[in-house]
Amino acid sequence: MPVRPINNLKLSAAVLLMWWGTVLSLSAAPPKVVDIKPYNDGFVEACIDGMIYWTDIDGVHLDSVNIRTVIAGIEVAEGSVLAVSPDCSVMKVERNGKTGRLCRSQIRGGSDKVTGIACSGDRTYILTENGIIYNTVDFKTFTPFDFNLTYSGYYDPARFSAICASAASIFIAGTYDNGMPAVFTSTAGNIWSERSLTYTDRAETLSLEQQPLSMAYDSRMDRFVLACTDGYLFYMPGCSHCNSLEHKALSDIAAVGFNDGRCLWTVE
């Protein structure tokens, strides 16, 4: 696969843009990119320091807004960006710079922290590291679901790092206490099933060992994709026996996004 360096592009972290047959790479200084989502004919990426960038399909920054708060994750809903902080405060951000706070902190005392936000249907789901899933339809009333408590004795406890949703499914991902990856899926956020992480390589059945750091939904291929440690992407289509693993980078992949056959990811 040919590799071409791209110069003089304004991005905020090490970024790779891929489409079938071509990989583009570039690098710049931190701050860390924590999330990437498709937006119209490009992407929107969020940095931990509060910067949000709208890009074209090639990942070139076009517009930006600084919300001046730490960002744990973003989601795009009805053309607006929903940015969630580690303490579960949510802001609505428009590309023209207009911002508004949808809710204030839902987490007190610093005992837990948010790792991501996702929308499915009319509901918004917010995931914490300890496995609390908050869901809301209006950002006024939140219903918490304690995954680790609910499934105690059935699933091993996990620490969660990513949430992603399509119109039909919600996925959460994290790591068990033994360091192995954990992925669960649900249709409504109240009943969860463990997702198989086995895949076939050279006729050998293996199981994912890398830890998930972020997750994206590839609507074109109808599959969820884990961004993992050691530079791997793990593809999870509707067929749970059709998973695949692909090595993309020399270091951990911090965030990944898909739009119309393009894949944009950042490395730590």
Residues of each region from the PLM?
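Conserved Ser/Thr-centered positions that define the repeating blades of beta-propeller domains
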Residues: T55-D56, V93, N135-T136, T185-S186, ...
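Loop/turn residues immediately N-terminal
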Residues: D49-I52, D87-V90, N130-I133, N178-G179, ...
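A short beta-strand motif characteristic of beta-propeller blades
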Residues: V60-V65, G100-I107, T143-G153, S193-S196, ...
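Bacterial N-terminal signal peptides that target proteins for export
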Residues: M1-W19
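Entry beta-strands of beta-propeller and related beta-repeat scaffolds
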Residues: G42-V44, S80-L82, R123-Y125, S169-I172, ...
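Repeated scaffold domains used in trafficking and secretory/extracellular systems
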Residues: P31-P38, T69-A77, S111-C119, D156-C164, ...
